[in-house]
Amino acid sequence: MAETSFDGARYVIKRYNCTSPLHRLRLAVSTSRAEHSFWAARQFTRIGIVTTLPVAWVQETSWGLRGRSWFVYEHTGDAIRADDLSDESDPKQIDQLLGTMVKNLVQMREHGFSHGDLKPPNYLITSSRAVMIDLDGVRQHKHARARQRALARDVARW
């Protein structure tokens, strides 16, 4: 990951590597993690889940095959990871995180989504909000049973 600024705004660039020739072949028939993260951030924003604001995704190609990719999103500002909270943390921050998590899980269930890697490091806490990050594992499920199993795994992982 890298941080940069442009025209007074701060951005984060997350790189996804292509690890092998087989990985390149798989990417020929599927979306890259950067593209998927961009899609997930847009979907979550649309349904009211607070996440990083997506700016762009970039895909490198060579000989017609996809390689590395980058996901660019707005920097969240001064934030701490949820796993940095402790018993001495501000109770308002803890309440904010828990309230946001419940709201997000309800929204995800109603719209058929699961996160795929829901855990404390994937929430950033700012002075005004809790922000869900690391969206490359997000899935939208067509069947209620699959969605319920995936959401149960998300909750258990926490």
At which residue positions do the language-model features occur?
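Short, glycine/acidic-enriched loop or turn micro-motifs at the edges of active sites
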Residues: 77, 120, 137-139
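Activation-loop N-terminal segment of eukaryotic-like protein kinases
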Residues: 125-128
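Conserved catalytic-loop position in the HRD/HxD motif
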Residues: 112, 117, 122, 134
